[in-house]
Amino acid sequence: MRTYDVVILGSGIAGCFLSRQLKLARPELSILVLEASDKMTDYKVGESTVEVAANYMIRKLQLSTYLYQHQLPKNGLRFFFDNEKKDLPLTKMSEIGSDHMPYHPSFQLERARLERDLIEMNRAIGIDVQLGAKVTDLAIDGERSHTVTYEQGGEKRDVRCRWVCDASGRRQLVVRKLGRKVTKETRLNTAAGWGRYWNVAGLDAVQDPAWRSRVRYTSRHLSTNHMMYDGYWIWFIPLAGDLMSVGVVYDKDRIGEMPRTKEAFETFIKSHRSSRELMEGAVFEDYQGYAHLAYYTDTFFSGDRWGLTGEAGAFLDPFYSPGSDFITTANELLTSLILTDLDGKKEELQERLELHNAFYRLKYESTLRLYAKLYPIFGSFEIYRLKYLLDFNNYYNLVAWPFMADKLTDIRWLREELKFSDFVLRAQDAMADLFARWGEDLRKKGQYFAHNEGQWANGLNGVVQFQEKLGPVLDEEFRKRELDKAYSSVFTGVVERMLGTPGLSTKKRVLSELSLPHVVMLKDVNEGTVDQILKRASVRLTRDLKAEHPEAGLEKVTLERSSAEGATLKIVGVPETAPEHAALLARANELWNEPGQSLTAIRM
């Protein structure tokens, strides 16, 4: 019976990526990949990548030349917002996007071709990939070798291995064999349907000079394009070779069940003017769907030397294209565990198992909070623009940068990061509740769709401060400042719009007094929230003015809420008749109106 260091179940991108990462890290490893299909021809969902997965493919898997020659570069994420009747032409829909290719690359992947090519590239570096090899049994032995039984060409074969890694997707071969718990996620009740089509002209075929020049003729076609609606979104993702992926993801709690046949799917897509016009002349290739998207397992990596990657472990939602990032993270953690074990570092392995499981679960929980309860706000440009500012900043700061700095397998960094996991989740919950409340407030006022026509926001401008920072050196002080800035400016941006106090989110002395902990503390926004914010800012204002005029007899500066100007100032301790009062008041107003580095003030 042949023995391998690692056997990987499945040769989709999760399995192909993991085997390639292991082999490139340790060329002497013996690796077997077992794939049940005899041909890789299926057009799989999960075509769109973002910065973490792209960095992984380029830096860890050495696929840069291949990706640029055989797949499509991605022009970031792009979002369009319709009116209530869903009849705006594409050129009139409000848009969040970019006017140039992003600083950090990402790609649109034609999965069937990629997986076929990866199999051949992996074989070329010494990985044993067997197609038509259906796994029929597993014997997990935490003390000795595992045994994997598979059938191929009518013959039964057994192999032994030290590690077995499940990349079998929703079949979850290891989890089901061991009887481990798989939990259907109830906090996010979404489903999806999608198809692939030929002859879809794409967004760049729209002939409107003003609309094209607004983005400096950068290719909208190459973006992952989201058509945003109350409770659902429609995607248009280009693939190499004139193929377009078109799909819809919807919140069943918000809008119930949607059509699940190919004909009903197309009827639904075409009930939206912009999507209907994009689909004119499209030629059908295939259709698939999932009745429920989100689930997770209780353990991702085991001391019995097995691990899960990709959809074998968990899945959430395709919004923001996180699937390949989850694969990247799982593979990075699994590779570290396998190499630590093979190096004989038993104590370190036990610590890594605990930390890696906790970190991967944190990734699941923090990503969940990007969507849970928030599908009802997706259709409002006004709300979503601020949510995107926060989410995009958090992605670059908390997700992309640590990966690019190789911190995901740094034990010391993981320990410190996990200490704050509960607080990070509470902060996300606080903002999600606030966005949801704002959405309900706008609906009651009849203003949910008020800004959905004719608006343009350049999303990349909100993260320009990170572009050149992201890399191998993690600047923790900079990360903390940017985290506080993101939460304080977006929080006050929502508050000023909900409570009618303009200008709060751009004031330096408001932002400097609202760190992330204060945002969590003030999460239950009501009429008194502005007073609390102004009280904190007035303390700072008083301190600054006293420092400039220590002999003036100033007792304090007060800020009182004003619907017209946000707040009005009063000087306490210096009589209005005193000659210095007017000068102090003028200076206090100057200090109060001094702009801060607010995300909401960025010209998007």
Predicted segments — roles?
Residues 23-45:
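Glycine-rich FAD pyrophosphate-binding loop
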Residues 338-518:
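C-terminal helical "tail/cap" subdomain of flavin- and related membrane-associated enzymes
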Residues 121-274, 331:
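Predominantly flavin-linked oxidoreductase catalytic cores and closely associated redox partners
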Residues 230-232, 253-372:
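FAD/FMN-dependent oxidoreductases across multiple families
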Residues 99-120, 255-260:
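Short beta-strand to alpha-helix junction loop
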Residues 1-14, 32:
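Beta1/beta-strand and adjacent pyrophosphate-binding region of the FAD-binding site
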Residues 41-87:
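N-terminal FAD cofactor-binding segment of flavoenzymes
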Residues 519-604:
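N-terminal targeting leaders
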